[in-house]
Structure formats: structure tokens, C-alpha cells
């Protein structure tokens, strides 16, 4: 049995192409692992706060100085990290907004990248602590960024590969549905993305 964590970051709800692509990945995973369970974390419906001073202080406070206030400030972070630790597979929906990821997804990432929780430093080098998990990214975009003249404009995939790899999530597969704003491509963009899914 596999535990799947589905992380939604699109603000478009039922009209979201990243969610549709994400669901195709999940459907394929459930067909492969019939007894799998899916936990859905919708970062738009259940917002993670952008980091403030209270969060940063709570993340780095020494154990002897911890307090109920600091523990409260860590609530979202602890929840997000626990969900990742319990999952075998992560399926993350990534609509590209302004060449990068949605702020809702960035806020979630800021809560999961934690010293002594998801990464540590050994001999001066960072080491990820979240290991042995598979990650699928369901990327949707109006432009075509996987190849061609605008490939360098995509800051979403390189960033996600780097930051997730930083905490140990290095087994990453990307599926794309792209070109929704490109004449001649937009009508087949979603279907082409769905047909590319293989897990």
C-alpha cells in the first residue's frame, strides 16, 4: 500500500489544468497501487501563512527556551512536515504564474524547509533528511517552457528540483501540460499532457 500526498497550489479550482494533470497522475498511481490512500492538501483552501518573525524565531528557538507560543507558531510547519514524512509519494500541482510557482506553494515550502527537521549540516555541507520518497510535479503553463526559445524563462522546475532536493527529495519526475495560451497548441495542451503521464 502506498500513501500519496496530493499538494494543490492552483487558485483556479475546477478550471485548473494543473489539478487535472495532477489527478491523472493520481489515477495512474491508484491503478498501479490499488490499496493506496490519498491525502489532499489544498494550499489555496487551507492557506499556509507567509513567514513572519514569530515563525522564524519559533523555528530556531533552543529546546530549553521553547514555549506554548512558539509551538503554536510552528503548527503549520509541523503539520506539513508530518504529512510529507508519512507519505510514500508526493504529487505536487504546479501552475506557472509569472514564470515561477504560486505564492501559496512558496509559503508551504518555507514551512517545510527546516533546519534539524528536514535538513541538517554535516561537515559544513547541507544534507537532506527526507528520503526514500517519490515526487511527481504536475506543471501547467500558458507558454511552452519545456523546450524552445522560452525554456530559460521557466524558474519553476529548476527551483523546485533544487529546494526539494535540498531536503532530500531527489527522485522527481515532471509531467507538463503547456501552451494553453499558444494558438495551435492550446486545444491539445491538456490532452497531450495527460497522455504523457506514465508512473
Q: PLM ranges: what are they?
A:
Residues 87-88, 132-133, 169:
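Short, well-ordered alpha-helix to beta-strand connector turns
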Residues 9, 140, 177:
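Cofactor-binding loop segments of dinucleotide-utilizing enzymes, especially the Rossmann-like FAD-
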Residues 11-13, 143-144, 180-182:
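Short histidine/acidic/glycine/proline-rich micro-motifs that form metal-
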Residues 27, 147-199:
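Glycine-rich phosphate/pyrophosphate-binding loop and the adjoining helix
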Residues 121-166:
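Short, glycine-/small-residue-rich phosphate/pyrophosphate-handling segment
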Residues 5, 39-41, 136-138, 173-175:
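Hydrophobic/aromatic beta-strand patches that form the interior of the parallel beta-sheet core
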Residues 1-94, 101-110, 114, 195-199:
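N-terminal beta1-alpha1-beta2 submodule of the flavodoxin-like/Rossmannoid cofactor-binding fold
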